[in-house]
Amino acid sequence: MNIIDGKQIAQNLRANIKLKVDALDRKPGLAVILVGDDEASEVYVRNKDNACKEVGFYSKKINKPINTTQAELLSEIECLNNSDKIDGILVQLPLPKHLDANLVIEAISPKKDIDGFHSENIGKLMQNKPFLRPCTSKGVMMIFEMIGVNLVGKNCVVVGASNIVGRPMACELLNAQATVTICNSKTKNLSNKLKQADIVVVAVGIAQMIQKDWIKPGSIVIDAGINRLDNNQLVGDVDFESVMQVASWITPVPGGVGPMTIAALLENTLIAYEGKI
């Protein structure tokens, strides 16, 4: 069993990005919009801001009050779309319930959509002609590359069908010529499907759902979930302590997929910058 150190892999990627940024005349610019005062979202935004500063990006944090209207938010995005200093735009999700997240995502220029959620970027990913790829699934693909996994012909099961992780992850694996099964909350006999998998990627938001006896010995298990238990402990969707006994590679939570998601975000910002040159 090998534990995948996402922090170390991400640190190496950030160091390479910084070398590229140091040679540029203008620093890539990232704008992050946070609506409201959700504590978890504030932590995520702060982590992204710190990562940007570490690699030498220009970082702009925009805090909007929780009662911000749809029109006000769209106007802010339009200003950033037209700004020469800003190469990437990120609106921190989830948004307050009175705001339409889909409308907000579609308002971001596809060329500055560093989250990779705009329908144009999702369409390019599905056509295997990606430009800005969704960050979590891209970060997972970076992990596979770093640990030397050949995905061609591998049986891969993605547990979770969200637009943020599950669906883009399935597309990434298909583009890598893997054989992909995507499961959701209605999937019957999930454990039987997982027992056939060479690679399992989980993102369902259910703490420690995936158990040791669901996993084929020697498989690779990627945990993209993050949950907080009653005792304040952060855990993933995989029962790490038991599954690590049978997996050949496994990501911890925290310290696995999370740092890689931010590394992918930084790389997307650099790609967006280079696309304007």
Curated annotation (Swiss-Prot):
Homodimer. GO terms for molecular function: methenyltetrahydrofolate cyclohydrolase activity; methylenetetrahydrofolate dehydrogenase (NADP+) activity. Belongs to the tetrahydrofolate dehydrogenase/cyclohydrolase family. CDD domains: NAD_bind_m-THF_DH_Cyclohyd. HAMAP family: THF_DHG_CYH (MF_01576). The keyword Amino-acid biosynthesis applies. Catalyzes the oxidation of 5,10-methylenetetrahydrofolate to 5,10-methenyltetrahydrofolate and then the hydrolysis of 5,10-methenyltetrahydrofolate to 10-formyltetrahydrofolate. Its EC number is 1.5.1.5, 3.5.4.9. GO terms for cellular component: cytosol. The gene is folD. It catalyses: (6R)-5,10-methylene-5,6,7,8-tetrahydrofolate + NADP(+) = (6R)-5,10-methenyltetrahydrofolate + NADPH; (6R)-5,10-methenyltetrahydrofolate + H2O = (6R)-10-formyltetrahydrofolate + H(+). It comes from the Bacteria. SUPFAM superfamilies: Aminoacid dehydrogenase-like, N-terminal domain, NAD(P)-binding Rossmann-fold domains. Pathway: One-carbon metabolism; tetrahydrofolate interconversion. Keywords: Amino-acid biosynthesis, Histidine biosynthesis, Hydrolase, Methionine biosynthesis, Multifunctional enzyme, NADP, One-carbon metabolism, Oxidoreductase, Purine biosynthesis. This is Bifunctional protein FolD. NADP(+) binds at residues 160-162, 185, 226. PROSITE patterns: THF_DHG_CYH_1, THF_DHG_CYH_2.
